[in-house]
Amino acid sequence: MSYIKGIDISHNNTVNWSKLDPEIKFVYCKATQGHGFKDPAFNTYWQYLKTKGLYRGAYHFLTATDSAQDQANNFLSLGIDFSKPNVLPPMIDIEDQVPASLNVNITKDKNAFIKLATDWINIVEAATKRKVVIYSYKNFFAEYLNNHSWPTNPLWLASYQPKEPGLPVGYKDWSIWQYSQDGTIDGKIHGGEFDLDYFNGKLQDLDKL
């Protein structure tokens, strides 16, 4: 199987881009969280990745206590043109709340949380004309999403093991695999370790994501 290397980052990471591993071809950057947070490093990362011609993507961290519309408005307010070359589809990060004790806001009504995610996806897809990438992990689908699936959306799975990730119910394949949350790469200065990713395809297939 052919994999393309990538990373995903936020303001918690600082990168010496001049030393970035040349095998890394795509970078997803945290853009927003909830109804009001915008990652303070996003604009700097976004513009630099453009100058380097790397594939670049933006993601939103879904919070259980804010409305889908408010969260979508926060993400869309960045004004990203998803029709531009090398711009990857929006990604929604559906996982444990921060801190994880806030997962109680999911478990008290899992169907409401599923609807929240679905509504965000629908709003953002209508606005951007791109299929949203779904990020989560297999156990989260089972424990918090009642094994609900979005089978027409690209799937990004977190699975920190040497073999390919197991698929959640309702999925036939994965598009991106986050295989490490504590990896190191050439170009890291400080700010914790990097999330390391594989894209399931060839470089030109990123244009079809």
Role assignments for model-derived ranges:
Residues S67-D70, A142-H148:
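Glycine-rich, charge-decorated loop segments at or immediately adjacent to ligand/cofactor-binding or catalytic sites
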Residues F61, E95, Y137-N139, Y160:
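Histidine- and/or cysteine-centered catalytic micro-motif in compact active-site loops
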Residues R56, R130-V132, L155:
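Hydrophobic anchor at the start of a short beta-strand
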Residues I9-S10, K30, Y135-Y137, A158:
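Short His-Asn-centered micro-motif
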Residues M1-S10, V15-S18, N146-L209:
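Functionally critical loop-and-helix segments that line ligand-binding/catalytic clefts
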Residues T128-A142:
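Aromatic-lined carbohydrate-recognition surfaces of secreted/lumenal glycan-active proteins
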Residues P99-S101, F140-E143:
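Short, solvent-exposed loop/turn segments at secondary-structure junctions
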Residues M1-T128:
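Substrate-binding cleft of extracellular glycoside hydrolase catalytic domains
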